[in-house]
Amino acid sequence: MRLNKIILSFVSALVILFSTSVASFAKVVGDKIILGAAISLTGKYSSNGVHTQNGYNMAVDRINSMGGVKVGGKTYKFDIIYYDDESNPKRAAQLAERLISQDGVEFMLGPYSSGLTKAIAPVTEKYGVPMVEANGASRSLFTKGYKYLFAVLAPANLYLDVAIETAVELNGGKPVRIAQAFEQDAFSQDVRLGILDAAERTGSKIIIDDKLPKELNDMAATLVKVKQMKPDVLVVSGHTKGALTAIRQIAEMKVDVPMLAMTHCDAAKLSKQHGKNSQYALCASQWHKSLTYKDDFFIKKSSL
């Protein structure tokens, strides 16, 4: 399972949130508390949105199978109202308004991506509706004083900084030369800031600092410079499409770089889609299969 670590935190967050809340303030149908979520089922983030929906459904299934949550001496289970935000921030904010003001939802689940989370957070704050989110990692989300935003993942600036530290360690403790290319979104720019911090901390040097094209379908210009300047590390963050483009073009252009560090390898299913070409890429992840946690629920779900 890709999401087990995040989902465990998500389950815990929901249980804590509801066990300390009053059910009369929630939308309740029978014995079910209704949650709301605007998710990217179409558009740029559709594959990640489906993963997010699957994760939320899995968490709710687990909570319900364990008997639900007790609030004020009464037991409740969960159900979720979903709308497709079309990977569009404006649409996401509109749907958050609809879920709260029309559907009566009093507890929200976050969308996919920092940008869409940023679009929805002001809406949930305005109405005082708690939102638990697992996919908005931009640290700027957590510097605005939001009182109703609860996240269960590491901030974006910590995703790949360890790659620079590892490269320095493998280089005998000496500084390294870094090439980097990033999408122009809140998440990727925070990943970039983490690399800049790591470079300063280790005395390393950024020799290529590029922007990925908006379509995320061609990074040849960056890779030409990588071949010419021969950095010790190449860092790429462009969500799922950017990861796929990077692996494909690195192979096509026969780029040889000692270390490649990227985000969204799991979501892009790199090992399945690109096989040996994706080997040895260092990838940011909220969990890893080598972690020892397991139980019957995750074993059964991961085998489906």
Regions found by a protein language model. Name each.
Residues 92, 152-175, 190, 218-220, ...:
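Hydrophobic alpha-helical segments within soluble ligand-binding/sensing domains
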Residues 1-34:
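Short, low-complexity disordered leader/linker segments with a strong preference
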Residues 44-54, 186-191:
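Glycine- and acidic-residue-enriched helix-capping/strand-helix junction motifs
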Residues 41, 147-211, 233:
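An alpha-beta-alpha
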Residues 44, 58-66, 83-86, 95-106, ...:
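Structured segments of extracytoplasmic/periplasmic soluble domains
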